[in-house]
């Protein structure tokens, strides 16, 4: 019975002794006089609070810095905090031999005469260091790190023996911004100290500044512990840092309610309920320790954006930000104007839908806000899509969290329910059609194409110019200038392999009057007539009219051109699969990818040239037709499809690729000798 009565007192006394031992163990005592005193000019020496006055160059000594961190660490192995012990792993400290210790003591056995100025300078350094160590802000920030460390060390969950790298990065983005607003004058000193706590002491200042930015974005695959770590961070912030205002916004009400409840349960586990004021009607938690200003958490959803208006959050966590209601984004982004506020966007990435993967557009931004967890690098995305048994990038050392199951069977089973869902939910930044990120045509080839043009009017060149040219027409039957236009190009053969662009048009209908076929045919005929006038050796033209948009209009265009052409013309004829009837049109299919590859090959080898006398009636006189074409050539992108095939296009926001398609297809079809080019059959059937 006596043992039972005194047990609580014994435990309390034991904890006090452990705290005292923890506070003193491994710490150097501050000497009354400097151990070392270099009597040089004040500008050439450096006062160290534990060693004395050292040469100024010692401030840049990494050896001295490592020595001090090893033998006088800021945090020892069994540091106590409100939530238990941190269990920090401490490096083994080398021990000096007895003989060496005796010799070193002899060096300092002689009395040293230290000047009064040196003593005053040393004492000032000691006071500054002690004031920094005991400042309220430093103790709060230190308490947060220690409490979070103890909390995540199997106090939060049995599985939380360690955290993932992205979770540590999320903690650092939160913490170092907090340092920058809580102690702006001492921010650099505090950051240098706390870098040791996170084991990033070798990180340079430019990289560390990224953590202090006012916005950060995390794209993490599903089921990896995003909300889990956010709840831990918010809970420990409320318990450790006073006068802090935190906001949490979720895409659904049940998610916000779950986080709200989990934070309450976490705080109740370690602290009495009297420290906490919960207001369920507006999702607010107010937590305050005795004699400290309370901190506040507000949990809201994107559907109730008015609840976050007028708030002064210093940290705003936006969970599943890709799926946030777009009407709420302006309200959320309004906190960027607040000087001491940071927005942290956290989301999984359903990259099969552009509307729910808009945050990935931040990739490549100079602010370096985007953080992505992916199992496949950009160079191997196509391999990942084409090989069913591949679950991660071959150039990665696969690290899978202990609570995640990823293998070939999981991938196969998941894709059975919905094709491609494993890729889009796991890879984070992939899409159902992946665009190549490298330049397809070299810059030197583009410069050569623009500058080195052929004088096709000279007799020497005309002697080698083939008498037959090829024209390709990609018609568009719309007056929407932003959507699409008609692309027309004329290409001639120079010698055995070289192709020369003699003329090109990018024609847009001004009005829809029912005469689109006639207007397109007139544009093509005018182009052909001008090319023939400049190059009188051209005697025949092979014409291909694309009929994917309207087969009837394509046939009409062929009839108009046949009646008005200045030279004999033949047309590509497509066979009707059911009746076998030949029609003067061309249906563009999967050969488009092959045609683009042929064009890319010709451009990179310099086998595709432009004429100095290139003809164009529709491209503005102030705009060089070759430069106009090059804008589309530079925008060529290779898109990988799910079936393993790929296609090419050069569509841009303010410019269509009609002219480029006509040039590509004209070059491709002019290279074949067995295509069905025939005169137009004009015999009447009635």
Curated annotation (Swiss-Prot):
This protein's name: Tripartite terminase subunit 3
EC number(s) from the headed UniProt entry: 3.1.-.-
Q: Which residues form the active site?
A: 320 (for atpase activity), 474 (for nuclease activity), 546 (for nuclease activity), 658 (for nuclease activity)
| Keyword Glycosyltransferase assigned | no
State the encoding gene.
TRM3
Where would you find this protein in the cell? Host nucleus
Q: What is its main location?
A: host cell
Q: What does this protein do?
A: Component of the molecular motor that translocates viral genomic DNA in empty capsid during DNA packaging. Forms a tripartite terminase complex together with TRM1 and TRM2 in the host cytoplasm. Once the complex reaches the host nucleus, it interacts with the capsid portal vertex. This portal forms a ring in which genomic DNA is translocated into the capsid. TRM3 carries an RNase H-like nuclease activity that plays an important role for the cleavage of concatemeric viral DNA into unit length genomes.
Any idea which GO molecular function terms this record carries?
DNA binding; hydrolase activity
Q: Which organism is it from?
A: Alcelaphine herpesvirus 1 (strain C500) (AlHV-1)
Q: Please tell me which stretches of this chain the record labels as motif Walker A motif.
A: 220-227
């Amino acid at each position: 019975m006596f043992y039972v009565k005194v047990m609580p007192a014994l435990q309390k006394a034991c904890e006090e002794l452990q705290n005292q031992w923890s506070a003193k163990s491994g710490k150097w005592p501050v000497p009354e006089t400097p151990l070392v005193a270099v009597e040089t000019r004040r500008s050439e020496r450096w006062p160290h609070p534990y060693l004395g006055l050292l040469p100024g160059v010692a401030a840049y000594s990494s050896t001295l810095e490592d020595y001090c961190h090893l033998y006088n660490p800021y945090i020892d192995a069994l540091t106590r905090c409100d939530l238990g012990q941190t269990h920090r792993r401490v490096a083994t400290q080398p021990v000096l031999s007895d003989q060496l210790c005796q010799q070193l003591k002899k060096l300092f056995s002689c009395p040293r005469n230290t000047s009064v100025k040196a003593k005053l300078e040393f004492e000032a350094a000691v006071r500054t260091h002690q004031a920094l160590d005991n400042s309220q802000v430093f103790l709060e920030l230190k308490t947060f790190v220690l409490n979070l460390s103890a909390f995540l060390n199997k106090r939060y969950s049995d599985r939380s023996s360690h955290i993932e790298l992205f979770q540590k990065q999320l903690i650092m983005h939160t913490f170092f911004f907090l340092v920058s607003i809580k102690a702006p004058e001492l921010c650099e000193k505090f950051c240098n100290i706390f870098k040791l706590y996170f084991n990033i002491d070798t990180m340079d200042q430019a990289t560390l500044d990224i953590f202090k930015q006012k916005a950060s974005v995390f794209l993490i695959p599903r089921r990896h512990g995003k909300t889990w770590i956010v709840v831990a961070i918010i809970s420990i912030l409320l318990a450790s840092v006073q006068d802090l205002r935190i906001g949490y916004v979720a895409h659904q009400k049940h998610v916000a309610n779950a986080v709200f409840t989990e934070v309450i349960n976490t705080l109740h586990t370690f602290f009495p309920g009297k420290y906490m004021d919960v207001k369920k009607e507006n999702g607010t938690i107010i937590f305050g320790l005795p004699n400290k200003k309370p901190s506040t958490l507000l949990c809201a959803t994107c559907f109730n954006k008015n609840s976050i208006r007028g708030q002064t959050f210093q940290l705003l966590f936006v969970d599943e930000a890709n799926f946030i209601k777009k009407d709420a984004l302006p309200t959320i982004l309004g906190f960027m104007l607040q000087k001491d506020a940071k927005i942290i966007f956290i989301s999984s990435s359903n990259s099969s839908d552009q509307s729910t993967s808009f945050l990935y557009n931040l990739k490549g931004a100079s602010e370096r806000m985007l953080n992505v967890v992916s199992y496949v690098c950009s160079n191997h995305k196509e391999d990942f899509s084409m090989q069913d048994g591949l679950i991660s990038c071959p150039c990665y050392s696969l690290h899978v969290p202990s609570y995640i199951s990823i293998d070939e069977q999981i991938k196969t089973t998941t894709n059975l329910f919905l094709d491609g869902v494993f890729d889009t939910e796991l890879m984070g930044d992939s899409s159902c059609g992946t665009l190549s990120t490298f330049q397809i045509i070299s810059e030197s080839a583009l410069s050569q194409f623009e500058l080195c043009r052929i004088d096709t009017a000279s007799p020497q060149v005309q002697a080698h110019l083939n008498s037959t040219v090829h024209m390709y027409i990609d018609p568009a039957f719309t007056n929407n200038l932003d959507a699409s236009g008609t692309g027309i190009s004329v290409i001639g053969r120079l010698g055995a392999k070289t192709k020369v662009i003699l003329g090109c048009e990018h024609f847009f209908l001004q009005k829809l009057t029912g005469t689109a076929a006639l207007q397109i045919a007139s544009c093509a005929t005018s182009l052909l007539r001008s090319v023939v006038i400049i190059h009188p050796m051209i005697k025949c033209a092979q014409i291909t009219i694309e009929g994917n948009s309207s087969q009837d209009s394509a046939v009409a265009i062929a009839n108009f051109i046949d009646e008005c052409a200045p030279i004999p013309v033949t047309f590509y004829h497509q066979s009707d699969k059911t009746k076998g009837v030949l029609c003067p049109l061309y249906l563009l299919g999967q050969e488009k990818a092959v045609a683009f590859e042929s064009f890319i090959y010709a451009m990179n080898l310099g086998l595709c040239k432009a004429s100095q006398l290139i003809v164009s009636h529709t491209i503005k006189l102030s705009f060089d037709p070759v430069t106009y074409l090059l804008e589309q050539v530079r925008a060529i992108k290779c898109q990988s499809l799910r079936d393993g095939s790929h296609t090419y296009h050069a569509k841009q926001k303010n410019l269509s690729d009609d002219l480029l398609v006509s040039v590509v297809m004209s070059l491709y079809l002019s290279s074949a000798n067995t295509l069905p080019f025939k005169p137009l059959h004009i015999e009447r059937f009635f």
